[in-house]
Amino acid sequence: MPFTIDSARGIFPNTLAADVVPATIARFSQLNAEDQLALIWFAYLEMGKTLTIAAPGAASMQLAENALKEIQAMGPLQQTQAMCDLANRADTPLCRTYASWSPNIKLGFWYRLGELMEQGFVAPIPAGYQLSANANAVLATIQGLESGQQITVLRNAVVDMGFTAGKDGKRIAEPVVPPQDTASRTKVSIEGVTNATVLNYMDNLNANDFDTLIELFTSDGALQPPFQRPIVGKENVLRFFREECQNLKLIPERGVTEPAEDGFTQIKVTGKVQTPWFGGNVGMNIAWRFLLNPEGKIFFVAIDLLASPKELLNFAR
């Protein structure tokens, strides 16, 4: 039987992803708006003690500036209500604007909002605010996660806020940065993997060369981000790269290559990914599971946030 996207998802089935992450996000989403906002605030304060968060790029903040000015112009009660509306996914102009932003703009918005709260320009979480028992349990779970898993939980928590009227709504993303100059690129090497397609995938993504990167995929190829359904088709995958993968640093370490049915090849690579938000402070433990067609094009690649560092050495089928 020829591979389908669904059957391709089953390659290297023993890869153990960090299922605690989507479980924690689901528990977070069930909290009331006040607890969600307070938990985000407490978690970011806690992370700030041990991690250096990079300031968002000017392009991201320019696109969020009007919304931030709008909130600053409100009274304290209105400010609190506006933030609660975001958490409640209320149908308001601000929530619709927020939902149209790419994840990086949303992260930049909350980063700047946190600064404004610290500076007294936006109503802070009330002093002495007591989290509910459920919220305290979620916070305790987050505190027990590895730093890369903490980042993923908090990122997804704010990315899912706002109000989306429909799938075809307007999308706003920061400008795509130009690809790194070819002469200044550093090529990766992967212990156990010499496949040119996989190596070029890593190199082009590290260089923000998304137009070259997407040509490694088949026309009906798919990419599955952590804890999400596959994104199918070159146009959709390219949009994902441009909106969510700018300035990532992929550090693949080792891998294994195996033949699959119908002349396909399956390759698993493990390593780390650093984000522009935390740089070298945090390396998320990642597995890439590639399925290449007989012509060497990417039919499917899954990106898994691993359950623990020991999974970096797990290549069992």
UniProtKB/Swiss-Prot annotation:
Residues 18-169 form the OCP N-terminal domain. It is found in: Cellular thylakoid membrane. Binds 1 carotenoid molecule per subunit (3'-hydroxyechinenone is the physiological carotenoid, echinenone (70%), 3'-hydroxyechinenone (16%) or zeaxanthin (14%) were all detected in overexpressed, crystallized protein), makes contacts with both domains of the whole protein. Upon RCP generation the carotenoid translocates 12 Angstroms into the N-terminal domain, altering its binding and photochemical properties. Induction: Transcribed from its own promoter, it may also be cotranscribed with downstream frp. Its cofactor is 3'-hydroxyechinenone. Disruption phenotype: Loss of NPQ induced by strong white or blue-green light, cells are more sensitive to high light. SUPFAM superfamilies: NTF2-like, Orange carotenoid protein, N-terminal domain. Proteolytically cleaved into a red 16.7 kDa form named red carotenoid-binding protein (RCP) which lacks 15 residues from the N-terminus and approximately 150 residues from the C-terminus. InterPro entries: NTF2-like_dom_sf, NTF2_dom, Orange_carotenoid-bd_N, Orange_carotenoid-bd_N_sf. Changing W110F: Acts like wild-type. Keywords: Antenna complex, Chromophore, Membrane, Photoreceptor protein, Phycobilisome, Receptor, Sensory transduction, Thylakoid. GO terms for cellular component: phycobilisome; plasma membrane-derived thylakoid membrane. Its main location: membrane. The keyword Thylakoid applies. Binds FRP via the C-terminal domain (residues 170-317). Upon RCP generation the carotenoid translocates 12 Angstroms into the N-terminal domain, altering its binding and photochemical properties. Acts as a blue-light photoreceptor and photo-protectant. Essential for inhibiting damaged induced by excess blue-green light via a process known as non-photochemical quenching (NPQ). In the dark or dim light the stable inactive form (OCP-O) is orange, upon illumination with blue-green light it converts to a metastable active red form (OCP-R), inducing energy dissipation, quenching cellular fluorescence via NPQ. One OCP-R molecule is sufficient to quench 1 phycobilisome. More OCP-R accumulates under high-light and low temperature; in the dark OCP-R spontaneously reverts to OCP-O. Belongs to the orange carotenoid-binding protein family. This is Orange carotenoid-binding protein. It comes from Synechocystis sp. (strain ATCC 27184 / PCC 6803 / Kazusa). The lineage of its organism: Bacteria, Bacillati, Cyanobacteriota, Cyanophyceae, Synechococcales.
